[in-house]
């Protein structure tokens, strides 16, 4: 089945709001074998909405619409759907009851007629229960096509996808099996990897497609398989990844579709009752955030210090003023001192530290823009690694976080082998 997503809202087109909904919807549809072939963002304009719905219906089996279901005059999606389906709005008693209950339980202001009017739905629509908001989702079967309308609020849309839309699609429509496995690599660019795996890629089975996805110092290789037999496709992908290891096994970092690297590191640490801390300068807590977002991180991650200011490095991490004066704040020596300071402060087996010059100015150091030092403290001692990640601040920060994770994983693996 082919799907098309239509997002409605001026706020998306002027860049005020980033469209994260389409990425989520596409990912969830792909999991159940529905392919998204096009995503279109349009303004809150009647003519534009009607024309887009007409065009989408000629390309797709499922048309998913988000946005324009609020209570104000600029929310015109329901009126446009009525015009498109030659329908009229009628009050849905079940939806109205839900709206009144939400106001009674959670909203301090009195319910207004505008709020009650959100229970007006096209008569041909099947109402989809929105547990988290007042705008009901809508499902239309028309001319062999499915049209689905949802609010643009991300958590409301996700609730409808999980509880209403995905279950209905799975129950009512047969779909092919689509499987993905994404190999995460480091240390080589995509062109260098392509050269190393050329013969492997040329001999991939016809059911498998390969995509190169470079991002912030890593290259992801996504293998996608499509067919009718899930076990066959899964075995096919696994066998190809086994073969891939013969070509680039030394730079394979992990698998994106399984546990992310921060979870893998956390599990390795927790299994041995080891712990981790971080000390960060220009990365501003991004490294610690990777770990705290991971489920179960409290079993191994003790804490972090963000020491952006030079004085903070001295006061909180015991980095000596003499060391800073001699080597500068962006140096291997300071990176090592920061890592050791974090290890001592939090009493952890492992600690990792970042110091660098992400730009746009040089700050407290004469180091070139993009210069980064990553320090790692382990039970065996402290090491530091130097890199230069260019002159784009966000790119420098992102690459530094990724590289720090790689170095940490390598250090932990080394100790697990000796354990």
Curated annotation (Swiss-Prot):
InterPro entries: CinA, CinA-like_C, CinA_C, CinA_KH, Competence-induced_CinA, MoaB/Mog-like_dom_sf, MoaB/Mog_dom
Matches recorded under CDD domains: cinA
Cited PANTHER family: NICOTINAMIDE-NUCLEOTIDE AMIDOHYDROLASE PNCC (PTHR13939), NMN AMIDOHYDROLASE-LIKE PROTEIN YFAY (PTHR13939:SF0)
Homology family: Belongs to the CinA family.
Identification of the protein by name: CinA-like protein
